[in-house]
Regions:
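Asp-box/BNR beta-propeller blade signature and adjacent active/binding-site loops
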Residues: 1-137
Length: 137
């Protein structure tokens, strides 16, 4: 299932988002602020996706969306959370479920690490648990 968008286009830009919910924020050891939330559609439902942006100047300015989690069909992505683990890695968690809640939805994660060139590289997404998670581990 391909649902990670590494170069979010027009659909994910501010002018096309009617609402935003469940924000999360984290600061990585290099001082960068990372923010996530979910949006899409006219409220909770199958058009929901997760967005990630960052600020390198303490929150004065923000990047365009750097990453979107946008599942296909009637599966929604929601309730994202960011966490920096003790080893300094940035983790993104989110839930996915069919429509509102299908009883078998789950929590997913991706981990970002800097490569040898200093660029941030995200791992492949993986499902880690059943249910929903709205707080840091």
């Amino acid at each position: 299932m391909e649902f990670v968008v590494f170069e979010p286009g027009e659909k994910y830009q501010r002018k096309n988002r009617k609402w935003q919910g469940i924000p999360g924020i984290e600061r990585t050891p290099d001082g960068i602020l990372w923010v996530t939330w979910y949006s899409g559609g006219h409220g909770e439902g199958p058009d929901n996706y997760v967005i990630v942006v960052c600020s390198k100047d303490g929150g004065k300015t923000w990047s365009k969306p750097l990453l979107a989690i946008d599942p296909p069909d009637d599966i929604r992505a929601f309730d994202p959370c960011l966490w920096v683990s003790p080893d300094g890695k940035l983790h993104l968690f989110w839930s996915m479920s069919k429509n509102w809640w299908d009883g078998i939805g789950g929590v997913w994660t991706m981990v970002a690490e800097k490569n040898i060139q200093g660029d941030l590289v995200w791992s492949k997404p993986s499902r880690i648990a059943d249910g929903i998670m709205m707080n840091k581990p």
